Amino acid sequence: MRLLDGRSMAADIGRSVVDDVERLATTGVTPTLAVVLPTADEAARSYVRVIERGAAKVGVGCAVHELTGDPDELTATVDRLAADPAVHGMIVQTPLPDGLTAADVGARIPVGKDVDGMNPLSLGRLALGLPAFAPATAAAVLEILNRAAVPLAGARACVIGRSSVVGKPAALLLLAEDATVTVCHSRTKDLATVAHDADIVVAAVGRPKMVGAGHVRPGAVVIDVGTNWTDAGLVGDVDADAVAPVAGALTPVPGGVGPVTTMLLLRNTVRAAGG
């Protein structure tokens, strides 16, 4: 079984990002990412610290805006950053204040600055095959598969999870690579049987160790998007101990999709700045 090391892939991406940042610096541009923290949520703050560390490594500016949980303050902040030419990329962390949805907030982010694919227009453009930033986690799934040289054209892919953040955009990205995609969810009957037919299994349901050996055909590639905190620590949606003897390749948790996601956010910011 091949372990798909997201940390080493992220480091490779980071080196190319540094090159692009240095090239932009010759034109007087510093790619800058604005991160909005709408509420005092510790999990969100923890992730933002990861983004800040990554940005510092590659030379991307990162401005964090910590808010009080007031909906009007959030929309005003997003509108101000959207109009600021010094801001090239924007992300808004969840949870959001009561009364606001991700679609409400995302619609206020210009598509050109929407480096995490939060604007519904970005998802629509993705569905139509038009240029747009995909949600970084979904893009990380494809990045890992491509870097691991996993054949996608004609492959059978099973995406377990249908969120607009991971499942749906990951399915669209796989379709764009000519994979044959099945999207499963909580109402899917005989999930294990459906998943077992796939060459590629993407687990993105937010349920610890839900995907077991019975879901995976011998030699299949398994991408574990899950990040679940349990008494035993951080675990994915895949029971890695059970699946590893069966799978041909598997992303670890931690150290798989997460590091690639962070670096893609920064790469998107550089691209939004003209890099």
Curated annotation (Swiss-Prot):
Subunit structure of this chain's protein: Homodimer.
Domain of life: Bacteria
Pathway: One-carbon metabolism; tetrahydrofolate interconversion
A Pfam family annotated for this UniProt entry: THF_DHG_CYH
Role description: Catalyzes the oxidation of 5,10-methylenetetrahydrofolate to 5,10-methenyltetrahydrofolate and then the hydrolysis of 5,10-methenyltetrahydrofolate to 10-formyltetrahydrofolate.
Name this polypeptide is given: Bifunctional protein FolD
Organism phylogeny: Bacteria, Bacillati, Actinomycetota, Actinomycetes, Frankiales
HAMAP family reported in the protein's UniProt record: THF_DHG_CYH (MF_01576)
CDD domains registered for this protein in UniProt: NAD_bind_m-THF_DH_Cyclohyd
GO cellular component: cytosol
Organism: Parafrankia sp. (strain EAN1pec)
Family (UniProt): Belongs to the tetrahydrofolate dehydrogenase/cyclohydrolase family.
Coiled-coil region list: none
Reactions listed under catalytic activity: (6R)-5,10-methylene-5,6,7,8-tetrahydrofolate + NADP(+) = (6R)-5,10-methenyltetrahydrofolate + NADPH; (6R)-5,10-methenyltetrahydrofolate + H2O = (6R)-10-formyltetrahydrofolate + H(+)
GO molecular function per UniProt: methenyltetrahydrofolate cyclohydrolase activity; methylenetetrahydrofolate dehydrogenase (NADP+) activity
Keyword Aminoacyl-tRNA synthetase attached: no
GO biological process annotation, one example: purine nucleotide biosynthetic process
Database matches in InterPro entries: Aminoacid_DH-like_N_sf, NAD(P)-bd_dom_sf, THF_DH/CycHdrlase, THF_DH/CycHdrlase_cat_dom, THF_DH/CycHdrlase_NAD-bd_dom
Disulfide-bonded cysteines: none
